[in-house]
């Protein structure tokens, strides 16, 4: 169950962060509406992925995904835009990922 959940979180992050990045590129970097449109499609697809999480609680899944989004956004920025996080960015992402583990995978 944990493996499936992690894969779904990674897929959700790629779709949401990638979609937002495509919209940003289309509008802010003036790459055009095709980029922005592709981003909107990716963002829409992200909305479906959370529904496949093994945990049935929407609030828990989306709260935990927030931590994945934090770390994933920093990683995306590093890969796609050459962003270099400082130690506080890394520390914050680590705290967020610990939160993901507690929220999603702590024994209940």
Curated annotation (Swiss-Prot):
PANTHER family: UPF0060 MEMBRANE PROTEIN YNFA. Its main location: membrane. The keyword Protein transport does not apply. InterPro entries: UPF0060 (IPR003844). Keywords: Cell membrane, Membrane, Transmembrane, Transmembrane helix. It comes from Mycolicibacterium smegmatis (strain ATCC 700084 / mc(2)155). HAMAP family: UPF0060. This is UPF0060 membrane protein MSMEG_3252/MSMEI_3169. Belongs to the UPF0060 family. It is found in: Cell membrane. One of its GO terms (cellular component) is plasma membrane. The chain crosses the membrane at residues 6-26, 32-52, 61-81, 87-107. It is a multi-pass membrane protein. It holds the Pfam family UPF0060.
């Amino acid at each position: 169950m944990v493996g499936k959940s992690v894969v779904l979180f990674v897929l959700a992050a790629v779709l949401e962060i990638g979609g937002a990045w495509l919209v940003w590129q289309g509008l802010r970097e003036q790459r055009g509406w095709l980029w922005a449109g592709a981003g909107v499609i990716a963002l829409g697809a992200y909305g479906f992925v959370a529904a496949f999480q093994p945990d049935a609680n929407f609030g828990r899944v989306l709260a935990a995904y927030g931590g994945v989004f934090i770390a994933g956004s920093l990683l995306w920025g590093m890969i796609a835009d050459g962003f270099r996080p400082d130690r506080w960015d890394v520390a914050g992402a680590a705290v967020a990922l610990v939160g993901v583990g507690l929220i999603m995978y702590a024994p209940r």
